[in-house]
Structures are given as structure tokens and as C-alpha cells.
């Protein structure tokens, strides 16, 4: 079945928490990609006082630091260079690879779009547009 994946590094803001609560009320499993260290270091901004990880069925920790920045620049009082972008992209790509492998093992053609920048890419992708739009 379907699931909802919500990505929020801090996990504290009202909208992602509300999205998770609505999904749960509809019996849709919620998968969260967040920084547990960051979430646990700040108060929630949702009226329930809950963080995103509190309402998730599955929590994937991106292992980010509070504030999501890891480098200091000479002459700057703030840290720079967030890790959540790179970590999140890598985690999502690993999940995609695992899902595709499992679908193929079950004999199911995964609905994967190929790059429109390769010859035949647009034509290949047409097969999925009608299928995915109906969902």
C-alpha cells in the first residue's frame, strides 16, 4: 500500500506535524526523515507539543547536528554548510534503489522515469504518465 514520507530536518514545525497527524487519521503509514538530535534540542511549534518523530510510524535519522550546519567561516559568527541536503539525497536514493530491487524481485515493473536528456527518454516516460496520474 501507499505511505507518506515527510522530510523535515528540525521536525518541530506545525505543518509537517499536522500532515503526519492527518495521514495517521486516514490510516496512511508515515515515514519521517529528520535529525533526531536537532528535533530533540528544540521545542515543538505544533499545538500538540509533538515533534514529527513523535507521530511517525518509521523514523529515519539523518544524523544531522542541531542547526544543520557544520563549518565555520573566518569572519562569520554563524556556521555554514548544512549536512541534511546531502544526507537526505543519499538516503532517498538508497530507499529508491531498495524499493526498485524489491519490486523487480516480485516481478513488478517499477514506475521509474528516465532522464529526458537521453535519446528515447521522453518516449519511455510516456508509459508511466497515465498510470501515475490515475493514482
Cite the ranges covered by each PLM segment:
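Active-site phosphate/pyrophosphate-binding segments
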Residues: 101-135
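Glycine-rich phosphate-binding loops that contact phosphosugars or nucleotide phosphates
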Residues: 1-97, 104
Amino acid at each position: 500500500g501507499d505511505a507518506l514520507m515527510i522530510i523535515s530536518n528540525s521536525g518541530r514545525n506545525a505543518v509537517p506535524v499536522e500532515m503526519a497527524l492527518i495521514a495517521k487519521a486516514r490510516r496512511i503509514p508515515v515515514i519521517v526523515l529528520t535529525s533526531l538530535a536537532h528535533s530533540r534540542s528544540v521545542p515543538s511549534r505544533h499545538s500538540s507539543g509533538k515533534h514529527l518523530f513523535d507521530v511517525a510510524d518509521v523514523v529515519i535519522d539523518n544524523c544531522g547536528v542541531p542547526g544543520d550546519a557544520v563549518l565555520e567561516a573566518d569572519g562569520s559568527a554563524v556556521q555554514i554548510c548544512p549536512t541534511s541536503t546531502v544526507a537526505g539525497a543519499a538516503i532517498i536514493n538508497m530507499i529508491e534503489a531498495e524499493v526498485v530491487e524489491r519490486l523487480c524481485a516480485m516481478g513488478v515493473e517499477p514506475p521509474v522515469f528516465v532522464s529526458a536528456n537521453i535519446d528515447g527518454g521522453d518516449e519511455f516516460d510516456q508509459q508511466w504518465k497515465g498510470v501515475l496520474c490515475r493514482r
